[in-house]
């Protein structure tokens, strides 16, 4: 065997003995993909989350709407009450030509009539004949009346059944608050005369004083 043949044989042997480097095995196209049910679960989860968010938003809108409706109703009720209470009677102002003192309004007549007719006139005004509350109120009226020489009927009369004076609202007369002068008999009525309260015949003609509560629900104009 010549040298050329030996070299060729050595090369072939070297090629045979050279280690082979195996290429990494190729992966299947589906190896990196998630299973189908995983993808479905993810889709359903996202859809459920979105639905939950929408439900929460809807509930929030509903609650806000209900609260707004309630607030509007309360405001409407308050406004209605305010409108009602700020009406003519709730302004706490007496009608024109009426005197105002504490929580009452007083009307002093300019004409004369019997006690019974005067009582009817006060009723028509939504008032009553004067019911004197105390000495301070009586003093206010005495100071307000310019015609000191006139007598003015008040809502006090003598009843034979009780043998006593009684106010027209049924309240018993208190002699500690008011002193009545003059003859007391059946058919007697009380009137303010000068600086005192006197007993006079109910059929006599006198002027009179009506009163009503300051917040009494009556029209603003005088009748």
From Swiss-Prot:
<keyword id="KW-0812">Transmembrane</keyword>
<feature type="short sequence motif" description="LCK-binding motif">
    <location>
        <begin position="32"/>
        <end position="35"/>
    </location>
</feature>
<feature type="topological domain" description="Cytoplasmic">
    <location>
        <begin position="1"/>
        <end position="43"/>
    </location>
</feature>
<keyword id="KW-1133">Transmembrane helix</keyword>
<dbReference type="GO" id="GO:0030246">
    <property type="term" value="F:carbohydrate binding"/>
</dbReference>
<keyword id="KW-0735">Signal-anchor</keyword>
<feature type="topological domain" description="Extracellular">
    <location>
        <begin position="65"/>
        <end position="223"/>
    </location>
</feature>
<dbReference type="GO" id="GO:0038023">
    <property type="term" value="F:signaling receptor activity"/>
</dbReference>
<dbReference type="GO" id="GO:0045953">
    <property type="term" value="P:negative regulation of natural killer cell mediated cytotoxicity"/>
</dbReference>
<dbReference type="InterPro" id="IPR001304">
    <property type="entry name" value="C-type_lectin-like"/>
</dbReference>
<dbReference type="InterPro" id="IPR016186">
    <property type="entry name" value="C-type_lectin-like/link_sf"/>
</dbReference>
<dbReference type="GO" id="GO:0042802">
    <property type="term" value="F:identical protein binding"/>
</dbReference>
<dbReference type="InterPro" id="IPR033992">
    <property type="entry name" value="NKR-like_CTLD"/>
</dbReference>
<dbReference type="GO" id="GO:0005886">
    <property type="term" value="C:plasma membrane"/>
</dbReference>
<dbReference type="GO" id="GO:0009897">
    <property type="term" value="C:external side of plasma membrane"/>
</dbReference>
<feature type="transmembrane region" description="Helical; Signal-anchor for type II membrane protein">
    <location>
        <begin position="44"/>
        <end position="64"/>
    </location>
</feature>
<dbReference type="InterPro" id="IPR051527">
    <property type="entry name" value="KLR_subfamily_B"/>
</dbReference>
<keyword id="KW-0472">Membrane</keyword>
<dbReference type="InterPro" id="IPR016187">
    <property type="entry name" value="CTDL_fold"/>
</dbReference>
<dbReference type="Pfam" id="PF00059">
    <property type="entry name" value="Lectin_C"/>
</dbReference>
<keyword id="KW-0675">Receptor</keyword>
<comment type="function">
    <text>Receptor for CLEC2D/OCIL. Ligand-binding contributes to inhibition of cytotoxic natural killer (NK) cells. May mediate MHC class I-independent 'missing-self' recognition of allografts, tumor cells and virus-infected cells.</text>
</comment>
<protein>
    <recommendedName>
        <fullName>Killer cell lectin-like receptor subfamily B member 1B allele B</fullName>
    </recommendedName>
</protein>
<feature type="disulfide bond">
    <location>
        <begin position="189"/>
        <end position="202"/>
    </location>
</feature>
<comment type="subunit">
    <text>Homodimer; disulfide-linked. Interacts with tyrosine kinase LCK. Binds PTPN6/SHP-1 in a phosphorylation-dependent manner.</text>
</comment>
<feature type="domain" description="C-type lectin">
    <location>
        <begin position="101"/>
        <end position="211"/>
    </location>
</feature>
<feature type="short sequence motif" description="ITIM motif">
    <location>
        <begin position="6"/>
        <end position="11"/>
    </location>
</feature>
<keyword id="KW-1015">Disulfide bond</keyword>
<keyword id="KW-0430">Lectin</keyword>
<feature type="disulfide bond">
    <location>
        <begin position="122"/>
        <end position="210"/>
    </location>
</feature>
């Amino acid at each position: 065997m010549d040298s050329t043949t030996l070299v060729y044989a050595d090369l072939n042997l070297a090629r045979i003995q050279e280690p082979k480097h195996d290429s990494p095995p190729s992966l299947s196209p589906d190896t990196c993909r998630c299973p189908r049910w995983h993808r479905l679960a993810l889709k359903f989860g996202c859809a459920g989350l979105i639905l939950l968010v929408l439900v929460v938003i809807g509930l929030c809108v509903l609650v806000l709407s209900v609260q707004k409706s309630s607030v509007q109703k309360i405001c409407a009720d308050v406004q209605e009450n305010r409108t009602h209470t700020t009406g003519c009677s709730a302004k706490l102002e007496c009608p024109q030509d009426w005197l105002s003192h504490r929580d009452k309004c007083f009307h002093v007549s300019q004409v004369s009539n019997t006690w019974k007719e005067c009582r009817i006139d006060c009723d028509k005004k939504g008032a009553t004949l004067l019911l004197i509350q105390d000495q301070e109120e009586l003093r206010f009226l005495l100071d307000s009346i310019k015609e000191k020489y006139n007598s003015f009927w008040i809502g006090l009369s003598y009843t034979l059944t009780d043998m006593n004076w009684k106010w027209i609202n049924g309240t018993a007369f208190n002699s500690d608050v008011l002193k009545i002068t003059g003859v007391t008999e059946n058919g007697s009525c009380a009137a303010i005369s000068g600086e005192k309260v006197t007993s006079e015949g109910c059929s006599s003609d006198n002027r009179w004083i009506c009163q009503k509560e300051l917040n009494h629900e009556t029209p603003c104009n005088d009748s």
